[in-house]
Amino acid sequence: MEKQRYERPVIKKLETNMPNKYGLRTEYRPMTHIDGVEVTQLIQDHGSPLFVISEQTIRRVYREAKKAFATRYPKVQFAWSYKTNYLDAVCHVFHQEGSWAEVVSGFEYDKAIRNGVDGSKIIFNGPDKTEMDLEKAIKNESLIHMDHLDELYSVIELATKLNKKPKVAIRVNMDTGIYPMWDRFGFNYENGQAWDALNKIMRSEKLELIGLHCHIGTFMLSASAYSAAAYKLADLALGVKKKYNHDIKYIDMGGGFASKNTLKGSYLPGSDVNPTFDDFAEAITSALINSNFEPDNLPLLILETGRALIDEAGYLLGTVISNKRSSLGKRTTIVDIGVNILFTSFWYDHKVTPAQPFTQYTEDTTIYGPLCMNIDVIRDSISLPLMNKGDHFVIHHVGAYNMTQWMQFITLRPKVVMIDANSNVHVIRKGETIDRITEFEAIPKHLEGFEL
Amino acid sequence: MQIKKNIAISESGYIFNPSSGESFSINPTGVEIFNFIKEGKTYEEIEQLVLEKYNTDKDTFDKDYHDFIGFLKQYHLLDYGEKEN
């Protein structure tokens, strides 16, 4: 007779009217498959931990976002935010869907070019563009979004040197009623810096002012702030039209849309309370349409949202190493996923679902990663179904930033696989090896050899 | 070591301690072990019964059993009378 699945014995004191930080049970069904592929099989074939990206989910979410904007505004263009996830396979899915590239460094710029993106469809943002980067961007007719006056002067100089008219926009920061106000990037709207930069561009006659850009924050939980931002950019664009009789071709509203993750400290789950693409689209497009643009001459609306497009498509599979008790008797579970590969666990209460059947019994648990570091906490407090040593689980919504901000620290970074629409599994990034890490190192001659 | 005589347990794992008014919930494996202790079975007997029925190993059971007993102690559900071991 086949033995039954073992669940450790637990006893829980029943207390009423005692709210606590662990919350209620959130998991009701195990996640045994991702896009038709068994989780245990994925771990068997590719090891644990393992990042899994669902191609179908990327395409579905992208199309939802596109639809939300395109049904409200006639000219919409998305540009894939490389820093959010610049694995080539991921970028290719977005480019196949029609996204341009939005990059913030020479490295990312080169990655976009290598991916086959036409230079004129690359938006070059960020405060650090070297002269070499700018020269490349000018020659490729990329869209240069200027962050500061030093950059503006460099671009004017390069335009003269190369005898080309670079296509430029300025990044504008502004008060949209949210805290904190992001004012470190670009030129301020309220104090006149933005107008100062626009006047310099128009008067120089060396640059083609093609757009206006803003990016008001990150993980925005209020769609109305985008409305304020869109009105202010529209005001600048209409001012340029009036003053210089020059049409601004596009308004780039940047990104910062919240994904469905739950921020730490949030009382309700992000999937229930965070604004939807429709909410953001309604705020932005209404502001642009209701401003004084001529109805037949509306600027192109560019969106650079990253997190909200890719978070849901990313899963991180892991394995339980041990169940322990803390000094106070609190249940702690150690898993093989550390904060070095799940950077976002500092921001979010990630949803964790066991990959095998479980009962309705849970324990208030702290999930620790495997790193020998006190900061390595994946969930401070979670009402977690009972899992045994060696059991597998799935962490949800990890597609944004984890595969770019991860660190090779203490242990090696795992593989990344992508599951296509036909449930085929493709390795899109190999796991690291010790040779790969040490090949960058060198030992000076006098340090070779020692006796212990 | 015995379960205190006045402690009541239902089939679904609801435990009531009439002397303190406290109530507890335990999962099915917990109910089984709780009842085995109540029946006066030794650790070795309980271990054998659990390993026969469930897909687990000695080490895991040993660790989980003592963890469970620790909580029964903490919640004052155990009685250390003549049979203490």
Model feature map: region roles:
Chain B
Residues 1-31, 35, 81:
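Acidic, low-complexity/disordered tracts enriched in E/D and polar residues
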Residues 25-85:
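Long, charge-rich, low-complexity alpha-helical segments
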